[in-house]
Amino acid sequence: MLKRTLYHFHFCCGLGGGAAGFNRARPRVGNVEAHWECLGGIDVDPAGLRDFERLAGVPGTLLDLFTRDQYIRFHGTEPPAGWREATPEDIRRAAGGRRPDAVFISSPCKGASGLLSEKMSLTPKYQALNELTLRCIWLMGEAWADDPVPLIVFENVPRLASRGRHLLDQINSLLGGFGYAVAKTTHDCGELGGLAQSRKRFLLVARHVEKVPPSCTSQRRRACAPSATSSAACRFPATSRPPAQCTAYRPCSGRPGCASPWCAPAATGAA
């Protein structure tokens, strides 16, 4: 088995959940097996970066990705003394001077969230926040323009596809200019992870056409049946139920100690 190391880097990295997931991945193609190492991440929240270092295993970089105009529209005031706009060189420095194999971008989603009213989402404050999506793509592309990142993964709330349609059109154009082919879809993290919760996300995947062949596939959904060691245990809280496509569970028949209406796998139900 041939071993290979791949490197990932994160924009708006938060506390590092995405980076931790990359670190756990062990992709295998034929007789080649790879493991991922994190080069770092960028965020504006110091507390989040402390968690990022703990989960990702490497320190992140405290950096504001707003342009000056975006900063003023979001905060309602001029930037403090000493503040400056981030540059492509700042991005390369945050990655330790290395070019990653994949970049994960999870820019703030509040402006496109259904939890925010349409009226509020159109205010200058939240329009500036939404524009970080485009800003991150531009900084990433310019940072490694001479040696493009092979794969870009961009995720956000599903409503970005409607409220942020104009931004996605610009992102598509920008990525095309940098040499990327783009695919957009939505997925449910609950289905992918075999969880009892539905958490839908918008997903954009961009591959550099000169570096990555057209062979990217969607993540397989996990089987929703319990593990062999917990087949008698309840997996779903009383307020939840299995995903609609899951046939491995049946309504609870009142097993002693069972607090969920959905528990044991059906006698004939393999996931």
Residues of each region from the PLM?
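Core alpha/beta nucleotide-donor-binding catalytic domains of modification enzymes
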Residues: L2-P148, P158-D169
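Active-site donor-binding loop signature of nucleotide-sugar glycosyltransferases
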Residues: L63-L65, C189, R220
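Conserved Class I SAM-dependent methyltransferase catalytic core
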Residues: L129-A206
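S-adenosyl-L-methionine-dependent DNA methyltransferase catalytic core
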Residues: M1-C38, L49, L174-G177, R201-A271
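Residue-level signal for pocket-adjacent positions within structured domains
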Residues: G60, S107, V182, H187, ...
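Short secondary-structure transition/capping segments
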Residues: W83-R92, P100, H187-V205, S230-P242
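Generic beta-strand hydrophobic packing signal
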Residues: L39-G41, V103, I152, T185, ...
